[in-house]
Amino acid sequence: MAIERTLSIIKPDAVAKNVIGQIYARFEAAGLKIVAAKMVHLSRGEAEQFYAVHKERPFFKDLVDFMVSGPVMIQALEGENAIAKNRDLMGATDPKKAEKGTIRADFADSIDANAVHGSDAAETAAVEVAFFFPGMNVYSR
């Protein structure tokens, strides 16, 4: 099995609900290590740049507005099959369709306020981790 890194964002809705610790406990219980983390309030420019892949989609403006509405917790996770493990923990994008016991089923309110973001592939994970943690501030352990 390959050791991978993936990016995870706990979105403003979940930060406001004070469930960061509960989400972190799920990462750790699944064997994922938090190798970098920071709380930030994204600027509009940062959110637009991070989600640029969705720029032409009808939901882009609402997504950016939501992501700048409050602080977010950003972390790089590391472990065997980290990308797939994190996506399994998150559950379906729409919390109404997410399996019971997933982060979105337990903490998300809607398809827009869906608690968490996670990289979807190795290539995007590398880009996303580098976007928020450039240089030497990711620490394997």
From Swiss-Prot:
It is an enzyme of class 2 (transferase). It is found in: Cytoplasm. Its main location: cytoplasm. GO terms for biological process: CTP biosynthetic process; GTP biosynthetic process; UTP biosynthetic process. It holds the Pfam family NDK. It comes from the Bacteria. Its cofactor is Mg(2+). PROSITE patterns: NDPK_LIKE. SMART domains: NDK. InterPro entries: NDK-like_dom (IPR034907), NDK-like_dom_sf (IPR036850), Nucleoside_diP_kinase (IPR001564). Keywords: ATP-binding, Cytoplasm, Kinase, Magnesium, Metal-binding, Nucleotide metabolism, Nucleotide-binding, Phosphoprotein, Transferase. GO terms for cellular component: cytoplasm. Its EC number is 2.7.4.6. The active site is at residue 117. Homotetramer. Belongs to the NDK family. Major role in the synthesis of nucleoside triphosphates other than ATP. The ATP gamma phosphate is transferred to the NDP beta phosphate via a ping-pong mechanism, using a phosphorylated active-site intermediate. This is Nucleoside diphosphate kinase. It comes from Cupriavidus taiwanensis (strain DSM 17343 / BCRC 17206 / CCUG 44338 / CIP 107171 / LMG 19424 / R1) (Ralstonia taiwanensis (strain LMG 19424)).
